From Swiss-Prot:
Gene Ontology MF, one: 4 iron, 4 sulfur cluster binding
SUPFAM superfamilies listed in its UniProt record: Prismane protein-like
Note accompanying the cofactor annotation: Binds 1 [4Fe-4S] cluster.
Enzyme Commission designation: 1.7.99.1
Stated name of the protein: Hydroxylamine reductase
Function: Catalyzes the reduction of hydroxylamine to form NH(3) and H(2)O.
Cofactors, names only: [4Fe-4S] cluster; hybrid [4Fe-2O-2S] cluster
GO cellular component: a single term: cytoplasm
Species this protein is from: Thermoanaerobacter sp. (strain X514)
GO biological process, one term: response to hydrogen peroxide
Name of encoding gene: hcp
Length: 547
């Protein structure tokens, strides 16, 4: 069997993974993910009609965003999960067809995504090998379809987190279905798909705004916070991923047990929320970005809870300490399900922690963050004054993702080389390349302002729009803000599309441009939006500073 996947920044040789994913997923899992996406496109096609007829069901929305989320890079590697999810998808698809039939709605059965069938698991795997990315022959149409699909995957992840906290928007679900249905439509042109990609950007903004509302309404607005990066002498649980509801339940259930809780990776920003500060056993952040987990999980000694991406295939030395939940999966790793009441029982992982040694200290000190839009706007007068007096000459948005590539040391060197009158605005795990450098401050304003998780790139957009208003500008691109963004997976794609929708131009992406962008599509993005790559720190610095 073979595969073809180029959805992440680490696509093999900058082209695509064909034997095994650089991420670690096997060819059969990659193909099954393709078939799940194909079937979700069919469900989307049908559910649009169900919405029009008023016979759509909320469970379809949830199935859609959970299914999409499970195919994001470093979320789920479990073959059996995808076999079962595909079977559920086919059953749901047939249920929607039946509902449409009862409502007197005719369905065009010529679309393969809504009519393929199977008898055995072998049938599923055979079909999976036929419906992947390369089944679209035209390179440019394929490129645009994948750009949209990956953007919708990112949107689905953010919609999932908002939904976990009780927030949803049917307009977002409707767009996701519309976009997935349209990538099946062979009558659409490249121009149609460019327009659809920008529309995805609009709904990306809406989804990030919804998640921001969900998080801040539930846990309060992030505030300036110093986070401990050392350890205590108690056993601990390390929680990674992005799911704040999982963290809340874990903190509640570990209270008074003698077990400490540490964040890892993208969970770091949880410390910025007021609601989590009441837990004395919520100790700090352990380690760095996701790709270093193979060493850090080993040293942590206690169990690790993966709530979302990024999971790296675990080494045998700590595999028995890894627990997954939500849509995360890996064969042979313990899974903690959600109960019928929406709650999770973390007693097993807590008891496991009690049997473990305390974490090995790998660093000590503090890092500062919590500069989401509400906090930054409280500092607006100070920031505006610093800009007007020339104390701050330029802001650099360096949000995004971190990754394994050695060339990503560029971002550390770039941050070090920035003039002392510049400020970095960041969100996502890209921050780990420079958030421990001690770059100082400008009139009390730290030179690295961390807004939070990757979805908190929304905060950076809100800050930019507010600065545009304060300075009386009619174009966001006239602000002294440059965009030097590191990307890795599909959530970064929806953030990019959101920025393009908001009119931001001259965004530089690295360490490489996406493999899924064909030369012609890349040219459109360069010509229309000024998208660029990166070269080296010295030349890029001159370019950004207008020298």
């Amino acid at each position: 069997m073979s595969m073809f996947c180029y959805q992440c920044q680490e696509a093999s040789q900058g082209i695509g993974c064909t034997v095994r994913g650089v991420c670690g997923k096997t060819d059969d899992v990659a193909n099954l993910q393709d078939l799940l996406i194909f079937t979700l496109k069919g469900i989307s096609f049908l559910n649009l009609k169900a919405r029009e007829a008023g016979v759509n069901k909320e469970k379809t929305d949830r199935f859609l965003f959970e299914g999409l989320f499970s195919t994001i890079t470093n979320v789920n590697f479990d073959r059996n999960f995808f076999i079962n999810k595909i079977k559920e998808a086919v059953a749901l698809r047939e249920e929607i067809k039946e509902d449409l039939k009862k409502a007197g709605i005719e369905v065009d059965e010529s679309c393969e995504a809504i009519n393929w069938v199977y008898d055995t698991d072998e049938d599923i795997e055979a079909i999976a090998a036929e419906v992947g990315v390369l089944s679209t022959k035209d390179e440019d149409i394929r490129s645009l379809r994948e750009l949209i699909t990956y953007g919708v995957k990112g949107m689905a992840a953010y919609a999932y987190h908002a939904y976990q906290l009780g927030y949803k928007d049917d307009n977002i679900f409707r767009f996701m279905e519309k976009a997935l249905a349209k990538v099946l439509d062979d009558s659409l042109t490249a121009d149609d798909y460019v327009a659809l990609a920008l529309e995805a950007g609009k709904y990306g903004v809406d989804t990030m705004a919804l998640l921001d509302k969900a998080n801040t309404s539930t846990y309060g607005h992030p505030e300036i916070t110093k986070v401990n990066i050392g350890v205590r002498n108690n056993p601990g649980i390390l929680i990674s991923g992005h799911d704040l509801k999982d963290l809340e339940q874990l903190l509640e259930q570990t209270a008074g047990t003698g077990v400490d809780v540490y964040t890892h990776g993208e969970m770091l920003p949880a410390h910025y929320y007021p609601a989590f500060k009441k837990y004395p056993h919520f100790v700090g952040n352990y380690g760095n970005a996701w790709w270093q987990q193979d060493k850090e999980f080993e040293l942590f000694n206690g169990p690790i809870l993966m709530t979302t991406n990024c999971l790296v295939p675990p080494k045998d030395s700590y595999k028995d300490r890894v627990y997954t939940t939500g849509v995360v999966g890996f064969e042979g790793v313990k899974y903690i399900p959600e109960g019928p009441d929406g709650k999770k029982d973390f007693s097993e992982i807590i008891e496991h922690a009690k049997r473990c040694k305390p974490p090995v200290e790998i660093e000590r000190g503090e890092i500062i963050g919590g500069f989401a839009h509400n906090q930054v706007l409280e500092l607006a007068d100070k920031i505006v004054e610093a800009v007007k007096t020339g104390a701050i000459k330029r802001f650099f948005v360096m949000a995004g993702c971190d990754g394994r590539m050695k060339s990503r040391t560029y971002y550390t060197e770039f941050a070090k080389a920035l003039p002392k009158d510049t400020v970095i605005l960041t969100a996502g795990c890209a921050k780990y390349r420079y958030n421990k450098l001690n770059l100082g401050d400008i009139n009390g304003i730290p030179r690295v302002l961390d807004a939070g998780q990757c979805n908190d790139s929304y905060s950076l957009a809100v800050i930019a729009m507010k600065l545009k208003e304060v300075f009386g500008l009619n174009d966001i691109n006239k602000l002294p803000i440059s965009y030097n963004i590191a990307w890795y997976e599909q959530k970064a794609v929806i953030v990019l599309l959101a920025l393009l929708y908001l009119g931001v131009k001259n965004i530089h992406l690295g360490p490489t441009l996406p493999a899924f962008l064909s030369p012609n599509v890349t040219k459109v993005l360069v010509d229309k939006f000024g998208i660029g790559g990166i070269t080296n720190v010295e030349d890029d610095m001159k370019m950004f500073m207008g020298e």
